[in-house]
Amino acid sequence: MRLVLDWDGTVTVADSMDLIVREFGDADLVDRYSDAFIDDSKPLPVTLQHVIETELATIKTPLDEVVAWLLEKVELRPGFLDLVERERPLLLSSNLRQLIEPVLAHYGVEADLIANELVADDSSGWRIQIDGEICPVCGERCKRQRLPAGEITYVGNGYSDRCPALASSRIFARCGLARYLDSIGAPYEPFGDFHQIAAALGRDA
């Protein structure tokens, strides 16, 4: 069974995309969209793709400066470095490859990665490329469409993890993803760090 991990808020303690938009872009926009995605009682006003594109377009700082700042701020969840050596998971993220790869390199991590692409970082604002077809289940260009074939153990925490998690055989969830799964009665295993996940996977090996 392939282990697939979300990045922001799952591997990282804090959402690194939110961090950089707050520092280099429009922090008020982050708050506005975060409130909308947290409130499960109301339909979402926009797609996740729109949120990502709009937030990142407010950043006008060159990528290398943002990466240098991020490497000083980002914190990885306890147990991740040990787990990634043992399992070599797939990292599946709505964030940008150009922001994730430097963090992995900084920590000496080798892992398979699927993420979105930054195509411009000039003074007119960052522009990105999100590939994939519209998902027939959720109606977005979601991460379900990029899951590998076969049985999946999925680990996630937020809105972008809902659809891929529900397509997986086993789910480890926290925060918003856990609340969503509770609301629809879907089974999952809660986690706080990757030591707990490693222990659960070890027991079932």
Q: Where in the sequence are the language-model features?
A:
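C-terminal cap/substrate-recognition subdomain and adjoining C-terminal extension
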Residues: E75, G79-L91, N95-A205
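Alpha-helical substrate-recognition element adjacent to the catalytic core
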Residues: M1-G108, D112-A115
